[in-house]
Amino acid sequence: MSGSLGRAAAALLRWGRGAGGGGLWGPGVRAAGSGAGGGGSAEQLDALVKKDKVVVFLKGTPEQPQCGFSNAVVQILRLHGVRDYAAYNVLDDPELRQGIKDYSNWPTIPQVYLNGEFVGGCDILLQMHQNGDLVEELKKLGIHSALLDEKKDQDSK
């Protein structure tokens, strides 16, 4: 990452660590493990990415991300109040890890899917967060971003 994207990701990582660990995730977040039934075939992956409105393939779980980029994705979703999503830990299944890279033709993890469509990784999600596109995409899915409430509260003061 370069410049402002790197600084913003670093700030998110620091914020996430200081926000307190446990109890952040509501009942909607499903750390689904590999969930692919021991494989990463295109048919299985197609079913996984279309199963939920928001699907994330990451290293680790939302409660314990195992890399900074996965942590940043989790924190961005948390900032927006997105709690109902499926999270698949690619570290649990090497076939899933390679399969999702082949499926998306994207070489890195994490990977984010909205309504069955590949969005990108950490850098893309961070950019969408910064420029407001993520709020709009979530709105299309019927998901209200918590940042809208925060902005409304600030505007009323």
From Swiss-Prot:
This is Glutaredoxin-related protein 5, mitochondrial. The modification Phosphoserine is found at residue 156. Monothiol glutaredoxin involved in mitochondrial iron-sulfur (Fe/S) cluster transfer. Receives 2Fe/2S clusters from scaffold protein ISCU and mediates their transfer to apoproteins, to the 4Fe/FS cluster biosynthesis machinery, or export from mitochondrion. Required for normal regulation of hemoglobin synthesis by the iron-sulfur protein ACO1. One of its GO terms (biological process) is intracellular iron ion homeostasis. It comes from the Eukaryota. Gene3D superfamilies: Glutaredoxin (3.40.30.10). CDD domains: GRX_PICOT_like. The keyword Transit peptide applies. Residues 42-145 form the Glutaredoxin domain. Belongs to the glutaredoxin family. Monothiol subfamily. The modification N6-succinyllysine is found at residue 59. GO terms for molecular function: 2 iron, 2 sulfur cluster binding; metal ion binding. The keyword Ribosomal protein does not apply. It is found in: Mitochondrion matrix. Residues 1-31 form a transit peptide. One of its GO terms (cellular component) is mitochondrial matrix. Homodimer. Interacts with ISCU. Interacts with BOLA1. Keywords: 2Fe-2S, Disease variant, Iron, Iron-sulfur, Metal-binding, Mitochondrion, Phosphoprotein, Redox-active center, Transit peptide. It is linked to Anemia, sideroblastic, 3, pyridoxine-refractory: A form of sideroblastic anemia, a bone marrow disorder defined by the presence of pathologic iron deposits in erythroblast mitochondria. Sideroblastic anemia is characterized by anemia of varying severity, hypochromic peripheral erythrocytes, systemic iron overload secondary to chronic ineffective erythropoiesis, and the presence of bone marrow ringed sideroblasts. Sideroblasts are characterized by iron-loaded mitochondria clustered around the nucleus. Spasticity, childhood-onset, with hyperglycinemia: An autosomal recessive disorder characterized by childhood-onset of spasticity, spinal lesions, leukodystrophy, optic atrophy in some patients, non-ketotic hyperglycinemia, and defective enzymatic glycine cleavage. Glycine levels in the cerebrospinal fluid are mildly increased in some but not all patients. The increase is less pronounced than in patients with classic non-ketotic hyperglycinemia. The lineage of its organism: Eukaryota, Metazoa, Chordata, Craniata, Vertebrata. InterPro entries: Glutaredoxin, GRX_PICOT-like, Monothiol_GRX-rel, Thioredoxin-like_sf. NCBIfam families: Grx4 family monothiol glutaredoxin. Glutathione binds at residues 59, 97-101, 109, 122-123. [2Fe-2S] cluster binds at residue 67.
